[in-house]
């Protein structure tokens, strides 16, 4: 039969195979066609990495199925896995290994079934389908292994109608898992469910234990509104388009509706609401868009440009961007290239730290401009700010925060505009563009806040 293999460059290779061929055989056929050694090939089907010893039929690969080919980074590395008993296991891995692969390696060494393993890195629970490089796990990183509790617990879910559903769960279940269990019982699709506990809306990727949900806790289930509403989209020409939508529609859905009405491809559309560029994967309700809200439609400029990003190690990365890309988009492109999560990236241009919601054109960043990438230190800290009245304010900050950021945090707490604030540490007035670490301000340091006289010079 014929199957297709799609590479990251978008090229599609056609192979003649049999259901009984092993994945290893398939890799050899790819080598014959493309010259890529099997040990550099990773084949993905239905989101799963295929193992050499298995056959196509094991994975239910049928004629004209499409596999995805990802190249392994050359050369493996060692990582460590620390258990709760304090034992440390050493594993040989590659950056391209999935978390699932790592769990299998742990099973081979320790005999612990993958479904009883939870792996934690940098305080985050790692998802099976992601790779080590997705989480920026590098050589000699240490993961923490927590065993899932065997034997679950009961929790209750109360609906708006007053009905109570009982669920069997484990502390390590994600909110997504819980929604699936509710769907199994009640038939309500997960994307129509919002779960509330202790007044907080629960996020899909988090676990019950993250929210300290214990046995016999009660969650509240709110349905996302079915039943639509009208919103307006205003173009730069002044034309207003009316759309029928639902709160649960994604921004991507909205762009498709605009395409249906106006013929503008989604990838040329930027939607703005309350000064913010809206992200495709988010829903209207995420942005608190209500009936008769007005969005603004800006067209992306066709034809991109190249910019450079220089890291502290001196490495320069080249990115394909558009002037209308947000800083957030740029950070995602850097993550795709370098594996550094956006929340660990700080981008600097012309001495200024760039804000996620702004675009390249907002900062007048043009073709072949160079941005500087500084990594945020993981993990925040507390500092104190003492006012002349003797009041002490506590702030959550990171060493990589600029003085400007700190002043904004003070404004959020105290309502004092940044331009009226002077911050003093160790007898020195602190400059807006510098970071806390530039001044060696460490956890529990105390800054002094002096108010500028109005109309000063």
UniProtKB/Swiss-Prot annotation:
The organism of origin for this protein: Aglaothamnion neglectum (Red alga)
Localization, per the record, is: Cytoplasm; Nucleus
Q: Give the family this protein belongs to, as stated in its UniProt record.
A: Belongs to the ubiquitin family.
Q: What does this protein do?
A: Ubiquitin exists either covalently attached to another protein, or free (unanchored). When covalently bound, it is conjugated to target proteins via an isopeptide bond either as a monomer (monoubiquitin), a polymer linked via different Lys residues of the ubiquitin (polyubiquitin chains) or a linear polymer linked via the initiator Met of the ubiquitin (linear polyubiquitin chains). Polyubiquitin chains, when attached to a target protein, have different functions depending on the Lys residue of the ubiquitin that is linked: Lys-48-linked is involved in protein degradation via the proteasome.
**Which residues would be cut away as propeptide?**
457
Q: Does the keyword Repeat apply?
A: yes
Q: What else is known?
A: For the sake of clarity sequence features are annotated only for the first chain, and are not repeated for each of the following chains.
This protein's UniProt keywords: Cytoplasm, Isopeptide bond, Nucleus, Repeat, Ubl conjugation
Which residue range or ranges hold the Ubiquitin-like domain?
1-76, 77-152, 153-228, 229-304, 305-380, 381-456
Q: Where is this cross-link: Glycyl lysine isopeptide (Gly-Lys) (interchain with K-? in acceptor proteins)?
A: 76
GO cellular component terms attached to this protein's record: cytoplasm; nucleus
Q: Which InterPro entries match?
A: Ubiquitin-like_dom, Ubiquitin-like_domsf, Ubiquitin_CS, Ubiquitin_dom, Ubiquitin_ubiquitin-like
Pfam families in alphabetical order: ubiquitin (PF00240)
User: Where exactly is the Glycyl lysine isopeptide (Lys-Gly) (interchain with G-Cter in ubiquitin) cross-link placed along the chain?
Assistant: 48
* Name recorded for this polypeptide: Polyubiquitin
Which Cys-Cys disulphide bridges does the record give?
none
């Amino acid at each position: 039969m014929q199957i297709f293999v799609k590479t990251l460059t978008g090229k599609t290779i056609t192979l003649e195979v049999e259901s009984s061929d092993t994945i290893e055989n398939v890799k050899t056929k790819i080598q014959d066609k493309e010259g890529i050694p099997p040990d550099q090939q990773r084949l993905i089907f239905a989101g799963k990495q295929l193992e050499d010893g298995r056959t196509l039929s094991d994975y239910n690969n049928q004629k004209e199925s499409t596999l995805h080919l990802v190249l392994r980074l050359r050369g493996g590395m060692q990582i460590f896995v620390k258990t709760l008993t304090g034992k440390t296991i050493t594993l040989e891995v590659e950056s391209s290994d999935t978390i699932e692969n790592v769990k299998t390696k742990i099973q081979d060494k320790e005999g612990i079934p993958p479904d009883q393993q939870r792996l934690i890195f940098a305080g985050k629970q790692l998802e099976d389908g992601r790779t080590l490089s997705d989480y920026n796990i590098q050589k000699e990183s240490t993961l923490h292994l927590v065993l899932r509790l065997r034997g679950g617990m009961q929790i209750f879910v109360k609906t708006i109608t007053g009905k109570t559903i009982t669920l069997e769960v484990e502390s390590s279940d994600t909110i997504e898992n819980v929604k699936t269990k509710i769907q199994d019982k009640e038939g309500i699709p997960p994307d129509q469910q919002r779960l509330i506990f202790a007044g907080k809306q629960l996020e899909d990727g988090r676990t019950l234990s993250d929210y300290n949900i214990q046995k016999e806790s009660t969650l509240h289930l709110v349905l996302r509104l079915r039943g639509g509403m009208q919103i307006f989209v205003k173009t730069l020409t002044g034309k207003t388009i009316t759309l029928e939508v639902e709160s649960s529609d994604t921004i991507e859905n909205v762009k498709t509706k605009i395409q249906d009405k106006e013929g503008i491809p989604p990838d040329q559309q930027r939607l703005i609401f309350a000064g913010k560029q809206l992200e495709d994967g988010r829903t209207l309700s995420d942005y608190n868009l209500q009936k008769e809200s007005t969005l603004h439609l800006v067209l992306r400029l066709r034809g991109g440009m190249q910019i450079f990003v220089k890291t502290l190690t001196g490495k320069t990365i080249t990115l394909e961007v558009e002037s209308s890309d947000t800083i957030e988009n740029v950070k995602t492109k850097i993550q795709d290239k370098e594996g550094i999560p956006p929340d660990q990236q700080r981008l600097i241009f012309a001495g200024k730290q760039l804000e996620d919601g702004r675009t390249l054109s907002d900062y007048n960043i043009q073709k072949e401009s160079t941005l500087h990438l500084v990594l945020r230190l993981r993990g925040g800290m507390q500092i104190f700010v003492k006012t002349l009245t003797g009041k002490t304010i506590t702030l959550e900050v990171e060493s990589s925060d600029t003085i400007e950021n700190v002043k904004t945090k003070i404004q959020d707490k105290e309502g004092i505009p940044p331009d009226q604030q002077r911050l003093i540490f160790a007898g020195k007035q602190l400059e807006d563009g510098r970071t806390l670490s530039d001044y060696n301000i460490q956890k529990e340091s105390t800054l002094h806040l002096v108010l500028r006289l109005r109309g000063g010079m």
